[in-house]
Swiss-Prot record:
Homodimer. InterPro entries: Adenylosuccin_syn_GTP-bd, Adenylosuccin_syn_Lys_AS, Adenylosuccinate_synth_dom1, Adenylosuccinate_synth_dom2, Adenylosuccinate_synth_dom3, Adenylosuccinate_synthetase, P-loop_NTPase. It comes from the Bacteria. GO terms for molecular function: adenylosuccinate synthase activity; GTP binding; magnesium ion binding. The active site is at residues 14, 42. Its cofactor is Mg(2+). It comes from Methylococcus capsulatus (strain ATCC 33009 / NCIMB 11132 / Bath). GO terms for cellular component: cytoplasm. CDD domains: AdSS (cd03108). Its main location: cytoplasm. This is Adenylosuccinate synthetase. GTP binds at residues 13-19, 41-43, 306, 332-334, 414-416.
Amino acid sequence: MAKNIVVIGTQWGDEGKGKLVDLLTEHANAVVRFQGGHNAGHTLVIDGRKTVLHLIPSGILRDSVTCLIGNGVVLSPEALMQEIGVLESVGLSIRDRLIVSEACALILPVHIALDNAREAARGGKAIGTTGRGIGPAYEDKVARRGLRAGDLRDTAGLPERLRELLDYHNFMLTRYYGAQGVDFQETLDSLLDLGGKICPMLGDVAGILHRYQSAGENVLFEGAQGAMLDIDHGTYPYVTSSNTTAGGASCGTGVGLLNFDYVLGITKAYATRVGNGPFPTELLDATGEILTQKGAEFGATTGRRRRCGWFDAVLMRRSAKLNGLSGICLTKLDVLDGLPRIGICTGYRYDGQEIDTVPIGADNYARCEPIIEEMPGWQESTAGIRALDDLPANARAYIRRLEETTGVNVDIISTGPDRQDTIVIQNPFAAG
């Protein structure tokens, strides 16, 4: 029987989704991205070789898997072709296995210019975007003035639509932000060139997924960023511009909600956040520095240093409800090796009261102080362990406590960056 499995990040992104998608595609016929853009950075390590993907689904490293980019993704034609070029340079076949939705909103150079101009204008109140034009492209999509991937086929009508869009945005860039405008002819020439390469890969992704469902094919839906960066449910305004929760898999691909069978939440054994925004369990001491350095907590897309802190069970309970999690994949357990004590946030102090929920809004959330429960650490190495019983006793106790405090079973444990450094307790494709 066909299984549709959704993989999402449960925290603030960078949880290790790429590795798990790559691992699970052994059982999948297709992998589809459903939101975000090339602001994502999914790092895969296979047989010691590191690959970082930003836009193309993580299943691309398996020759038998079809990869799709759904309508919920904002697509940079330039970034897509650059990524294809990098993968083809190491001998991978890409273009015959990649299908891009005609309904994808396009990211243009003017969106990048707007993104950077806005962040500069915000100064100390900057959101901390990746500067890739994601937000402005989503704005144009919602305002119904943006270009879509299918428009690349209409070479006759493209110039007029592009000029209208650039006139609108260049007015804002030059008159309001005092920045340089974006050149029309240069943008048009680039789009026509890139369009000729991308158009053969365009297709009706929703229709293809419907056919897969009818044919009994397994499909993996790959989320980007994390649930607490969701435009509606995250720590607004320090969020991304798309729905990063599991519900985004439906509207971002055209697959109905009742067709999803399992939602796997990828969760670090501690917490990280990149950019600005409230982070109650953040560690600004030597332990935080250990997590940063040992966990190599630097962004795959921007190289920015990630802030590190203890696991937040309050946030995870919220995330579990928002996403309807079926199970958790716990990643980077090995980063905690050697710590004498490990903390878990089980509640917050908020305006003098103890609460066990996440307040709405960044200003309210910033007033929360974590209530930390400490557990003994372990000195043994967990790196590369592939059987649950081989983990140190204190590591197993830590995992059990995470299950108790979040209310969700840990079905998979990642003990290292390589595809095989994994303990699979319950395979989502085999779940009843």
